[in-house]
């Protein structure tokens, strides 16, 4: 947790972020889908269905369903691992990278680091 932000402030940022995502005309992701997406994009290294299931402590079918939705939205894609054809790799996409940039912007705004902060300073 950031040293200068209380738990209440962080929950407020989360709420504002979720509300902004709900209001916008963009991908509508469940909490699990968002968790899988963020794990793939924020943790370095190759990701597999098996590894994501272990990291998130959910079943492989749950990861597969989340990846089905992320794939429909072109936020992630799956590819058979050429080194081990039993394993499926999860890959990032340009659209997923753009979504992550947007998400970071929304969170910056919600935390007061964006236009809101500039408006408050000008007032």
Q: Where do the protein language model's features map onto the residues?
A:
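Amphipathic alpha-helical dimerization/coiled-coil segments
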Residues: 17, 21, 101-123
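Generic structural signal for well-ordered, non-membrane alpha-helices
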Residues: 16, 35-38, 65-71
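Basic, amphipathic "hinge/linker" alpha-helix immediately C-terminal to the N-terminal HTH DNA-binding motif
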Residues: 82-103
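Canonical helix-turn-helix DNA-binding module
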Residues: 46-88
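N-terminal leader segment of winged-helix/HTH proteins
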Residues: 1-27, 123
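N-terminal helix-turn-helix DNA-binding core of bacterial DNA-binding proteins
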Residues: 19-58
């Amino acid at each position: 947790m950031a040293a200068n932000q209380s738990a209440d402030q962080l929950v407020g940022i989360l709420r504002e972020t979720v509300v902004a995502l709900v209001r916008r005309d963009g991908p509508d992701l469940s909490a699990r889908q968002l968790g899988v997406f963020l794990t793939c994009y924020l943790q370095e290294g190759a990701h597999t269905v098996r590894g994501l299931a272990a990291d998130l402590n959910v079943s492989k079918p749950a990861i597969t369903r989340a990846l089905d939705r992320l794939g429909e939205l072109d936020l992630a894609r799956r590819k058979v691992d050429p080194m081990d054809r039993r394993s499926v790799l999860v890959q990032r996409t340009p659209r997923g990278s753009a979504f992550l940039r947007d998400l970071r912007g929304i969170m910056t705004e919600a935390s007061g680091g964006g236009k809101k902060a500039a408006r408050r300073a000008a007032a």
